[in-house]
Amino acid sequence: NDLRLFYGSCFALITTAFSFAIYAGILPQLGEDFDLSATQLGFITSMWLLGFPISMILGGLFYHAIGPKRIMQFAFFSHTIGIILAIYSGGYAGLIVATLLIGIGNGCTEAACNPMIADSYTGKRMNTLMNRFHMWFPGGIVLGSLSSLFFTNLSLGWEVQMWYIIIPTVIYAYLFYGQEFPKPRISGDAAIVKN
């Protein structure tokens, strides 16, 4: 069970990394398809960066009250709706909302998975798995960037690249489904006071 949660966490972080890398790769296509200015493309990108810290802060504050399971359920909802909305957005406003949702899902992933791994293991094992978990952010960016380049060179549309992000999303949802999540080792009151 613990290893399944760990692997699910890794795929959730790969989803975060893919969204970061693939969005960077498809920005020129979005600009062409929707006649968007550089300023508008920058604002779309900033929504990813806005949703990420907001949900990470709120998820961290409420981790002990609602637990990692609910936070990751919300992450899955945000990732899935954000990806689908981006694909069918039809324009600037839809892309703004979609990117914000994806950013929120990414922040929820960080808020839930880091403490969940820390609560599941102790000592050297925890250190090892935390390092392996965090390896998947730069690793996922490399994989996502190469995938985006490959799809672009094949002249596949940006929509295909957005659908590609759904693959690790579905995998982490499957790995988390039906699993018992660990209880926090310290009380929520102590965590909030320290924060």
What are these regions (language model features)?
Residues 4-38, 114:
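Extracytoplasmic
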Residues 17, 21, 103-111, 142:
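Small-residue-rich segments within alpha-helical transmembrane domains of MFS-like 12-TM solute carriers
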Residues 21, 48-57, 142:
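Residue-level signature of mid-helix packing/kink "hotspots" within the transmembrane helices
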Residues 52, 78-83, 102, 168-172:
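MFS 12-TM fold signature
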Residues 54-93:
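Conserved MFS/SLC helix-loop-helix module at the cytosolic interface between two early adjacent transmembrane helices
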Residues 98-135:
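Cytoplasmic helix-loop-helix junction between adjacent transmembrane helices
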Residues 124, 129-181:
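Helix-loop-helix hairpin linking two adjacent transmembrane segments in secondary transporters
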Residues 177-195:
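Flexible cytoplasmic inter-helical loops of multi-pass small-molecule transporters
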